């Protein structure tokens, strides 16, 4: 009975051994290795192999245990893979999320002295430095994926340095510190996603494992490394201050060794790469060896070269303390962007030749020359800006206004529309409308504030062949809804520049094109309607009561076609008529009265000033037409007006109908509003006979509203908006309402760019 049990146990062990032997033969290992394996190693390797099939389900051949016919090409592929591993100067390894090594190539024994069988199936934490355990855990940790759940599989790149155990002899191990060798690992973390059947838009992801290649860094004995033509070596202190440089640095970077000694490496590295270099420097001090990322080393004559460095800390042989840093640097490219100076140590070349500049790409200098040539050939054309700008906030003057036949506003910027040449005018050759360069859609000019969609659809204005676009657009531009039972009082200011001549000279006002600088509105007896006045200069802003617009009060302004060919002539005639009126207005200051009816004196609009330009932009001109002050007081304060005198079909006065009257025709009641944009002192603009403390305040109690609600509008050239014949016809159709044109002074805020200019205030008095 005892003998029988012994035989049964022996048979069982033999069967078990035979099964393990058959299992070992199925492993993708040479038979010489599998025949020497024990049972524990066979189980460890088998489990690792099964895990590998999960990572690479199609990369390990046929199904488990199935023998397949191998073609000669398959044998060539295996041999090629073996040769690639030998020439890789490294080893390949695959690590599971728990740290188990699922696979490692046999070349690991060359770098670490540890066999493939010994490492496979064991935890990688057993073979790395304890200080690197946390880093390895972070590498193997996968964060919440940001990819779409429809993506089944993706990779996350990983690059890190590990100190792995090395059991090689010192003569073959290279640099080791405490039995550990620095290995540069680079690879990717493989993530696989699965969708749930019950929730197709939700899913889960699986961290399959890490696939990486380990490279052994150059040994510390740098004298054994052959320096090729694209390599140079330097020795530096622990803070990267250069101590010694190879003479090849002069051929590769242009710097002589003595130019770089006693300077840190950071001093000659591109500013965008200093962070990566700092991280590599930190790893070097911690682990002893490092491979930097590609960084840009500045060349002496401008530009840079791309460099990658292999740095090693050399220890003192006696004290075993870190002594210095030795780095082998590989210059990967020629000098790029020659002539581009990024450091004071660089010497700019006599003729900068950027590598990215081609014959078809103009340089900045060529662009400037081309702009100057275009400016000299056509002074009347404006240089447009890619972004919409507003003349009320940009005080620079357009280059096209310096010598333009129309002059221009002192506040005209490069984006303000100017009169185009006939060849460049949009539409037909007879179309003299303004070119709205900064606006793609003209409807945004007509309806610049909050309107109902029905208003935009039902009463959208369409330009006809005989319609001047500039007149239509300016005439339909409004700032609010006139309220019933109150007197709408519309006004517009247009700035005219002063030429280099004296303000009193007649030539100072020749050929000047007015531009509307701002549009404002007053309702009632000198009271501002805050619900309808736009307070923000932003082009997309609207008043707070934008939802209270009543579309029935807004009808299209009456329009009568005029002769386009006589627009410029009419404008010049208007300016000449204005000059005649200005000559009549040159009277003693006692003939002027304040708007409030008090006996305050007002500074003359055109006087010789001997003081420097003011610091703020001032719009003065609180003047009356040639009517008595009592008439104005009766009309505005006494309310001696017909209740329907200003009710012109409850529609705002079209700016396209506003024009200067003849010199013999004076407005019956026009109150001119003045606005101090920057609250400048008015005393500097007074003559000797005026009181120094008097300021032309119009409705002083409401001056805060003037400062708050002034809205700046650019882009409407008045020569497109009227001719004298049209205004006469329109004024007769508006119950005999008259129009008045007066002038006031306009100063430039910037002393460097300051130049005097006049502006025309056009008001519709009622």
From Swiss-Prot:
Domain PAC stretches: 292-335
One GO CC term, this protein: nucleus
Residue span of motif Nuclear localization signal: 368-387
InterPro entries the record matches: bHLH_dom, HLH_DNA-bd_sf, PAC, PAS, PAS-like_dom_sf, PAS_fold, PAS_fold_3, SIM_C
Biased composition (Polar residues): 353-365
Limits of the bHLH domain: 1-53
Record Pfam families: bHLH_HIF1A, PAS, PAS_3, SIM_C
Gene Ontology biological-process annotations: cell differentiation; nervous system development
Residue stretches of biased makeup (Low complexity): 373-385
Region annotation Disordered: where it falls in the sequence: 353-431, 528-563
Domain Single-minded C-terminal: 336-766
Molecular function per GO: DNA-binding transcription factor activity, RNA polymerase II-specific; protein heterodimerization activity; RNA polymerase II transcription regulatory region sequence-specific DNA binding
Bias (Basic and acidic residues): 394-404
Keywords tagged on the record: Developmental protein, Differentiation, DNA-binding, Neurogenesis, Nucleus, Repeat, Transcription, Transcription regulation
Subcellular compartments: Nucleus
Role: Transcriptional factor that may have pleiotropic effects during embryogenesis and in the adult.
Binding partners and assembly: Efficient DNA binding requires dimerization with another bHLH protein. Heterodimer; forms a heterodimer with ARNT, ARNT2.
Protein name as annotated: Single-minded homolog 1
Source organism (scientific name): Pan paniscus (Pygmy chimpanzee)
């Amino acid at each position: 009975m005892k003998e029988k049990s012994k035989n049964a146990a022996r048979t069982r062990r033999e069967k078990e051994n035979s099964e393990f032997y058959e299992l070992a033969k199925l492993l993708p290992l040479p038979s010489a290795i599998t025949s020497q394996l024990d049972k524990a190693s066979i189980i460890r390797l088998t489990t690792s192999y099964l895990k590998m099939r999960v990572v690479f389900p199609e990369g390990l051949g046929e199904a488990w245990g199935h023998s397949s016919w191998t073609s000669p090409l398959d044998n060539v592929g295996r041999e090629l893979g073996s040769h690639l591993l030998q020439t890789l100067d490294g080893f390949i390894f695959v690590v599971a999320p728990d740290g188990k090594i699922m696979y490692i190539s046999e070349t690991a024994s060359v770098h670490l002295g540890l066999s493939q069988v010994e490492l496979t199936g064991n935890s990688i934490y057993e073979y790395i430095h304890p200080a690197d355990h946390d880093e390895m855990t972070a590498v193997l940790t996968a964060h919440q994926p940001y990819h779409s759940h429809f993506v089944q599989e993706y990779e996350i790149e990983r690059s890190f340095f590990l100190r792995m155990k090395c059991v090689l002899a010192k003569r073959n191990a290279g640099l080791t510190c405490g039995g550990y060798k620095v290995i540069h690992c680079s690879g990717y973390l493989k993530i696989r996603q699965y969708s749930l059947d019950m929730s197709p838009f939700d899913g889960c992801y699986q961290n399959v494992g890490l696939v990486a290649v380990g490279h052994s860094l150059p040994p510390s004995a740098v004298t054994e490394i052959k320096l090729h033509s694209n390599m140079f070596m330097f020795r530096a202190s622990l803070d990267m201050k250069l101590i010694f440089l190879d003479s090849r640095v002069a051929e590769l970077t242009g710097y002589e060794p003595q130019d770089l000694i006693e300077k840190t490496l950071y001093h000659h590295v591109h500013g965008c790469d200093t962070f990566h270099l700092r991280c590599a420097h930190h790893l070097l001090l911690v682990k002893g060896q490092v491979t930097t990322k590609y960084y840009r080393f500045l060349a002496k004559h401008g530009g840079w070269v791309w460099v990658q460095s292999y740095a090693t800390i050399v220890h003192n042989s006696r004290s075993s303390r870190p002594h210095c840093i030795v780095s082998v640097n590989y210059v990967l490219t020629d000098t790029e962007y020659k002539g581009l100076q990024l450091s004071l140590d660089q010497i700019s070349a006599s003729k900068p030749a950027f590598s990215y500049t081609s014959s078809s790409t103009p340089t900045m200098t060529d662009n400037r020359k081309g702009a100057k040539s275009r400016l000299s050939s056509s002074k009347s054309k404006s240089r447009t800006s890619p972004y919409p700008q507003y003349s009320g906030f940009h005080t620079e003057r357009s280059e096209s206004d310096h010598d333009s036949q129309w002059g221009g506003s002192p506040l005209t910027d490069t984006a303000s529309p100017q009169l185009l040449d006939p060849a460049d005018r949009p539409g037909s050759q007879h179309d003299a409308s303004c070119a709205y360069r900064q606006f793609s859609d003209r409807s945004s000019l007509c309806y610049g504030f909050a309107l109902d969609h029905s208003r935009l659809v039902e009463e959208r204005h369409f330009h006809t062949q005989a319609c001047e676009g500039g007149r239509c657009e300016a005439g339909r531009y409004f700032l609010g809804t006139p309220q019933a039972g109150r007197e709408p009082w519309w006004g517009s200011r247009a700035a005219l520049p002063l030429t280099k001549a004296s303000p009193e000279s007649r030539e100072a006002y020749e050929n000047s094109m007015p531009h509307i600088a701002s549009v404002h509105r007053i309702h009632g007896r000198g009271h501002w309607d805050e619900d309808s006045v736009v307070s923000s200069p932003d082009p997309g802003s609207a008043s707070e009561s934008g939802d209270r617009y009543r579309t029935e009060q807004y009808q299209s302004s009456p329009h009568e076609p005029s002769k386009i060919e006589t627009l410029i002539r009419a404008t010049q005639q208007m300016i000449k008529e204005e000059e005649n009126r200005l000559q009549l207005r040159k009277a003693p200051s006692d003939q002027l009265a304040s708007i409030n009816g008090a006996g305050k004196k007002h500074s003359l609009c055109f006087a010789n000033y001997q003081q420097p330009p003011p610091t703020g932009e001032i719009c003065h001109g609180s003047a009356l037409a040639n009517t008595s002050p009592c008439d104005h007081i009766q009309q505005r304060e006494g309310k001696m007006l017909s209740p329907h005198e200003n009710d012109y079909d409850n529609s705002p006065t079209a700016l396209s109908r506003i024009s200067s009257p003849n010199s013999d025709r004076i407005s019956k009641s026009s109150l001119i509003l003045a606005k101090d944009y920057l609250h400048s002192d008015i005393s500097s603009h007074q003559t000797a006979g005026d009181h120094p403390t008097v300021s032309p305040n119009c409705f002083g109690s409401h001056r805060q509203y003037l400062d708050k609600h002034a809205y700046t509008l650019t882009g409407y050239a008045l020569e497109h908006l009227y001719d004298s014949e049209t205004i006469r016809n329109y004024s007769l159709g508006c119950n005999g309402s008259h129009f008045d044109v007066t002038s006031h002074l306009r100063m430039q805020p910037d002393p460097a760019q300051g130049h005097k200019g006049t502006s025309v205030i056009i008001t519709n008095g009622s």
